[in-house]
Regions:
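A short mid-domain helix/strand-loop element embedded in enzyme catalytic domains
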Residues: 1-4
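Amphipathic, oligomerization/interface secondary-structure segments
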Residues: 9-144
């Protein structure tokens, strides 16, 4: 789905790219939230934030799920100080019928960039936590 969106984007098909990327975000909502939950748990985020993220996974309405977690995203996953899920929801909620193909192409590019950055931040956060735990474990085993 993502690759189809990327192909449309490269070909300048804004509405097509927008629709494919919207499907990626909506279809992968639970998976994205699961990764965010892993980061939240790894960094010992407040229990309320983790509970909100878990509840959003059960929510069938994409918009409601995003509204429910707008304050639950760990700081280290913010992009330019902004919640990436809120940014994505804001772009996606406008709908293709309200925009020209050119505008949809710009939005599709923005959605792809935010998705990519979120994926990188998730990967780095989980890797950093694993590496830190290993380092602490190794240092604790050193003889006194």
């Amino acid at each position: 789905m993502f690759l189809k969106g990327r192909r449309c984007e490269i070909q300048g098909l804004g509405i097509g790219a927008f629709v494919y990327y919207r499907r990626v975000v909506e279809d992968q909502k639970d998976r994205i939230l699961a990764e965010i939950i892993k980061v939240a748990q790894a960094i010992s985020a407040p229990a309320e934030a983790i509970a909100a993220l878990q509840a959003a996974q059960s929510e069938h309405q994409f918009g409601k799920a995003m509204d429910d977690v707008k304050d639950a995203i760990p700081q280290r996953l913010l992009i330019e100080g902004q919640n990436p899920l809120t940014l994505l929801h804001s772009a996606l909620s406008k709908g293709v019928h309200n925009h020209s193909d050119e505008t949809c192409l710009g939005l599709a590019t923005d959605i792809r960039l935010v998705l990519g950055e979120l994926a990188e931040l998730l990967g780095h956060a989980l890797k950093d936590e694993r590496e830190l735990k290993k380092a602490v474990s190794r240092l604790r085993r050193l003889p006194s």
